[in-house]
Amino acid sequence: SRVAEVTGASQEEVLAKWADPSYLNELINTYWFLDDTILQEGILYPLEGYLYPETYIITSTNPTIEECTQMMLDMTDQHLSTYREDIANMNWTVHEFLTMASIIEREGQNETDYPKIAGVFMNRLNSGMLLQSDITVLYALGRTGVDVSYADLQTDSPYNTYMYEGLP
């Protein structure tokens, strides 16, 4: 990861820091959009989706993992704050909102696809149907791409939205 390169830490150290419950609790107490959801069992990468993808200018000569994380979460705060009221009106957690956004982004070929995909998924959820997203199955399998086999759809994982209701 780029954070490992910039800080001089190993990728394992960065991931360990981002999975450390005491550190995550500090972040939960600092950022309005983080909650105990990221501490739930089965969450593969607690901060996934919360670290805003951007090119950051780092002026510190020896930045820490914590400083880099703060920069990314501060940027997430800036961008996500504009949707705060919308998220509340949907009766969704921020985690659910970001999960749905991630699925839509991966399912679509380009931004013009996103509203159509969102509409299909929202209709499925509102009708009590399974989400049935191939992307979530691939995520469960640790794969990228678009090809999903019948055997893949049998994967028993909470991320498999062909088997489990709601959002992963």
What is each model feature region?
Residues S1-V6:
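Membrane-embedded segments
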Residues T7-A9, Y23-P168:
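Bacterial extracytoplasmic/cell-wall-associated proteins, especially those involved in peptidoglycan
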Residues A9-D20:
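Extended intrinsically disordered, low-complexity coil regions enriched in Ser, Thr, Gly, Ala
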